[in-house]
Amino acid sequence: MSTYTRPVMLLLSGLLLLTLAIAVLNTLVPLWLAQEHMSTWQVGVVSSSYFTGNLVGTLLTGYVIKRIGFNRSYYLASFIFAAGCAGLGLMIGFWSWLAWRFVAGVGCAMIWVVVESALMCSGTSRNRGRLLAAYMMVYYVGTFLGQLLVSKVSTELMSVLPWVTGLTLAGILPLLFTRVLNQQAENHDATSITSMLKLRQARLGVNGCIISGIVLGSLYGLMPLYLNHKGVSNASIGFWMAVLVSAGILGQWPIGRLADKFGRLLVLRVQVFVVILGSIAMLSQAAMAPALFILGAAGFTLYPVAMAWACEKVEHHQLVAMNQALLLSYTVGSLLGPSFTAMLMQNFSDNLLFIMIASVSFIYLLMLLRNAGHTPKPVAHV
């Protein structure tokens, strides 16, 4: 059976349009708030409201999928995000935008859980690495194109909201021409997220998603600040961030294929070791281009490989709950990691960014090496 089936291709096509809309809004909302002369703490609280919505959406989506299936859950998630987009134009104010960004956060997280769970359930233990690699490539390409759109079109609020809302609704169209089957058995009891987080044989995958959240959250949020403090111009910062993200895009497919062929444990060990090497190279401040490239290629591909590792340790009917647990773990890591790292950078040195990334990666590498002889046979084959 082909890895990239018609439902998978149509699902990823819809996701590309949704990711474009998400990237544009996430970039422009803080700027719009600043234009309304809102204080820094208000901008921060509105951003936190969005991420709080992410957490709530992650927790709710498993129940929604079980009740109405993948297709209708995807439509619902898209409509919720579209409402969060359009609502920004109804009333411009702190409390109004606090509420609408929460709604958008819920819809965004629901989209991620639905798409990731559908891909997990569509694949087998032999091709999930490639499916998740394709998913991450679409996500990063959509994010890149979204940034490109921001630089080429008018960024006025009432100019952007109509076409961003339209993009979100257009993301529904591909799924109208196919049906993603919900293959969870009806005779199984509902699986809780907590039980998945506690599952011993999947712990390396859960921990890997937390580490991935810390690494990517820190790189996304703090790398521009690090470069700025080193005297790099804004234009050059954009170039170096493009190098980082491009490396992540280029690394997805080959690493996903290697994980399917040689096993995810081996690939995870190599990835984490390369992240440590890239961090050390950045600290040495020699040859920043190759250092950033290998850091991006290894760091940005941790999440899909760790996710595939965890999902092959559970039964098929547990995949949606496991995916929720993994996305929740990633979100927690991406929230806590940058906050703690930023405090260290402010009080000590900007170099703590890469020391922190190398340290958490080293701890995870020890976990991976410790489990050398404990690799139970995958159970989610079908």
UniProtKB/Swiss-Prot annotation:
It is a multi-pass membrane protein. It is found in: Cell inner membrane. It comes from the Bacteria. The chain crosses the membrane at residues 14-34, 45-65, 79-99, 102-122, 131-151, 157-177, 204-224, 235-255, 270-290, 291-311, 325-345, 348-368. Coiled coil: none annotated. InterPro entries: MFS, MFS_dom, MFS_trans_sf, MFS_YcaD, MFS_YcaD-like. The keyword Membrane applies. GO terms for molecular function: transmembrane transporter activity. Signal peptide: none annotated. The keyword Transferase does not apply. Its main location: membrane. Keywords: Cell inner membrane, Cell membrane, Membrane, Transmembrane, Transmembrane helix, Transport. GO terms for cellular component: plasma membrane. CDD domains: MFS_YcaD_like (cd17477). NCBIfam families: PRK03633.1. Belongs to the major facilitator superfamily. YcaD (TC 2.A.1.26) family. This is Uncharacterized MFS-type transporter YcaD. The lineage of its organism: Bacteria, Pseudomonadati, Pseudomonadota, Gammaproteobacteria, Enterobacterales.
